[in-house]
């Protein structure tokens, strides 16, 4: 009997640890009401209309004029400017080698997006274009302490005077933690996916949302293919809002609408 009690105590302790690690924010941020049923154009409405590369001003305008929320990605440049761009490197979208964070804004403005005449926009240019017409989901692209705090600080300096609605999210828990500490008024989210086969214990911890104790996110944005992840479901059960990414077809977009009240899509235009 004592052995059984010991086992139960150990299991209870493990459960308590998991709950502590996975628990989202205790609060219910008022902006979660906006996220309920919200659909978001991934990097703007790109790949649908001519001459609208991802994360470009035309792609943002195409979404905004249709009343569709927009997901954007932001990096910090070598000279401390905040630009809207997804990849860490420039080869896929600009056809040149190089790391975006090693370039100055001036150097980046000489490049073109996806073989078009459009340039890499700054965060300021994006905000001026959207001007509060639709909500923005801003992903902070950082993977290290070297860029995390500078990016968060620089972006916040720009965003603090923005009158429109925005949410922040990141795969990097310290970036979400920065907003937890310094901008409690902003609805913050932890991005994740099923990285169980990736090398590194930190990737497995991210997949299981075991780093939530750092950021206590208001919502969890998870790759929809891994909807059944028990840790994701536990986090939602504990009170996190559920957001899913990235849907590329109408069938799955509709299929997972209940599991993910907020859905990010690309390569098609959802039916109204």
What are these regions (language model features)?
Residues 1-272:
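Phosphate-group recognition and catalysis centered on beta-loop-alpha active-site segments
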């Amino acid at each position: 009997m004592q052995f059984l009690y010991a086992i139960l105590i150990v299991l209870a302790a493990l459960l308590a640890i998991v709950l502590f690690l996975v628990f989202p924010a205790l609060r219910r941020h008022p902006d979660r009401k906006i996220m309920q049923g919200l659909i978001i154009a991934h990097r703007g409405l790109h790949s649908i209309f001519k001459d609208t590369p991802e994360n470009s001003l035309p792609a943002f305008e195409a979404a905004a004029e249709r009343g569709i929320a927009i997901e954007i990605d932001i990096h910090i440049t070598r000279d401390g400017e905040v630009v809207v761009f997804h990849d860490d490197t420039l080869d896929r979208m600009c056809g040149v080698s190089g790391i975006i964070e090693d370039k100055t804004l001036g150097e980046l403005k000489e490049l073109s997006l996806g073989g078009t005449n459009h340039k890499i926009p700054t965060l300021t240019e994006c905000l001026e274009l959207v001007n509060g017409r639709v909500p923005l989901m801003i992903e902070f692209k950082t993977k290290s302490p070297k860029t995390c705090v500078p990016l968060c600080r620089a972006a916040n300096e720009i965003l603090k005077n923005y009158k429109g609605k925005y949410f922040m999210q990141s795969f990097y828990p310290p970036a979400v933690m920065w907003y937890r500490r310094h901008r409690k008024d902003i609805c913050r989210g932890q991005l994740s996916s099923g990285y169980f086969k990736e090398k590194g214990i930190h990737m497995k911890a991210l997949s299981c949302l075991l780093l939530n104790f750092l950021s206590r996110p208001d919502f969890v944005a998870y790759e929809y293919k891994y909807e059944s992840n028990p840790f994701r479901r536990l986090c939602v059960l504990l009170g996190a809002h559920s957001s899913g990414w990235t849907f590329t077809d109408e069938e799955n977009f509709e299929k997972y609408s209940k599991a993910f009240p907020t859905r990010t899509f690309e390569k098609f235009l959802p039916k109204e």
